[in-house]
Design a protein with these regions (language model features):
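Hydrophobic helical membrane-anchoring modules
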Residues: 1-43, 188, 211-280
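Short, well-formed alpha-helical segments that are part of the catalytic scaffolds
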Residues: 31-35, 55-70
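Cell-envelope/extracellular polymer assembly enzymes that use nucleotide-activated donors
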Residues: 45-47, 78, 221
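A conserved hydrophobic helix/loop-capping motif in glycosyltransferases and polysaccharide synthases
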Residues: 46-55, 62, 82
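Donor nucleotide-sugar binding loop of glycosyltransferases
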Residues: 55-58, 85, 108, 134
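A conserved acidic beta->alpha catalytic loop
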Residues: 81-90
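Acceptor/aglycone-binding surface of glycosyltransferases and processive sugar-polymer synthases
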Residues: 104-118, 123, 135-216, 242-261
Length: 280
């Protein structure tokens, strides 16, 4: 990876969400009329991508909240499930108007990468389909993306509110802050919650980042590549909710994969560990 570039800032006036999306706030009654299917000639403004692995307990709520956001924005959109489930998740998704794709490989990162190949929107949202993220926050994140002319917006759990039972104390007070610190030290990312799974970014940003990893380190890779390429990342505080359904992650294994990936790819790798020790 190359040396991180400096991200520039601008003071010029940016258009508001209503200027870019005139129908924003109208609340369309027939939201299904705004949903774009995979064969439609209509190009969606927004692609909402959710990786799913046996999420039948929460997928309906996630899709409904995403549809509420689409209705508020009043723009053509697609909801994409990148699904490897053995339960009723894909059937529920299709019934509610989502496009379901089945990745040909396993892995959190690969599920996203596979779906991104099929996503056609100008703006792309990614979020876990376990009810921990509120997809009705999409208009708020999109507003920040447009008004700040940023390339990516992260929903920050650590700057927002983490509801009781939604995140283990070890993750809240040690794991996530420490992993974020690593990224900020190595890549000057300047973020508070580098591993939030709720993000929105432009198509141009995705093409610049061009992620390659297949596992949980995918979340780190996106921030690393965005920083290296000088993309503007901004954050919006969000509420992190308790999940529906069984946990599918291995905390220690996935955390170590993040750390190892950051160390192996950090500028000045031989000096990475001493650098982190001095910075903490």
């Amino acid at each position: 990876m190359s040396t991180p570039k400096q991200r520039g800032s601008t003071q010029e006036q940016r258009p508001g969400l209503n200027e870019v999306f005139p129908d924003s706030g109208r609340q369309f009654d027939d939201v299904d009329g705004l949903l774009v299917d995979r064969d439609s000639e209509t190009i969606p403004t927004l692609s909402i991508v959710m990786p799913t692995l046996n999420e039948e307990a929460g997928i309906a709520e996630c899709i409904q909240r995403a549809k509420n956001a689409i209705a508020e924005l009043g723009v053509p959109a697609e909801i994409i499930l990148s699904d490897s489930s053995t339960d009723w998740t894909p059937e529920i998704g299709r019934k509610m108007g989502a496009i379901v794709h089945t990745p040909d490989k396993q892995g959190y990162g690969y599920a996203y990468r596979y779906a991104f190949r099929h996503a056609r929107g100008k703006y792309i949202v990614m979020g876990d389909a376990d009810t921990t993220y509120d997809f009705e926050d999409i208009p708020r994140l999109l507003s920040h993306l447009v008004e700040t002319d940023a390339d990516m917006v992260l929903g920050s759990r650590l700057d927002g509110e983490i509801r009781p039972g939604s995140m283990p104390a070890l993750h809240k007070y040690v794991g996530n802050p420490l992993l974020t610190k690593f990224l900020n030290v190595f890549y000057d990312a300047g973020v508070s919650d580098a591993h939030s799974g709720f993000r929105i970014f432009t198509r141009e940003a995705l093409e610049t980042i061009d992620p390659e990893t297949n596992g949980m380190e995918f979340a780190s890779e996106m921030i690393m590549e965005a920083s290296v390429n000088g993309l503007d990342i901004v954050e919006v505080p969000i509420i992190y909710h308790e999940r529906e359904g069984e946990e599918t992650l291995d905390s220690f294994r996935d955390g170590w994969r993040h750390v190892r990936f950051m160390l192996e790819n950090a500028p000045g790798y031989l000096f990475s560990i001493p650098g982190v020790v001095l910075a903490l």
